[in-house]
């Protein structure tokens, strides 16, 4: 959830800003990222191929959340801690190859963003566990 917040602010149609031609005319976008997860075209296609979810849409919240889980699970199998949202986000942004090369070290702004993602992730986790206790209570409903 903290990745979605950071990448798209929970907006289904989020896209990167356009570059400007002659400082005024809207031009091409900086990347092919689209939707809640801001997944790039090639990575999204890999996800659809590997999961068999050929009808997945980056503008669908469920599909985007599943994509982020799929991508993070690749990190888990490479030794990432599942609760280390900071490192997972850096790998999400830079790619696992870029993370291994530590390309993020040349981007202090990205490290700050990853720290915010970790903080938000911890907050969301605490909120979830608070709600989980309430949801597990047995209730009787009368119709």
Label each residue range with its predicted role.
Residues 1-135:
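Catalytic glycan-binding domains that act on GlcNAc-containing polysaccharides
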Residues 133-143:
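Low-complexity, Gly/Ser/Thr/Pro-rich intrinsically disordered linker/tail segments
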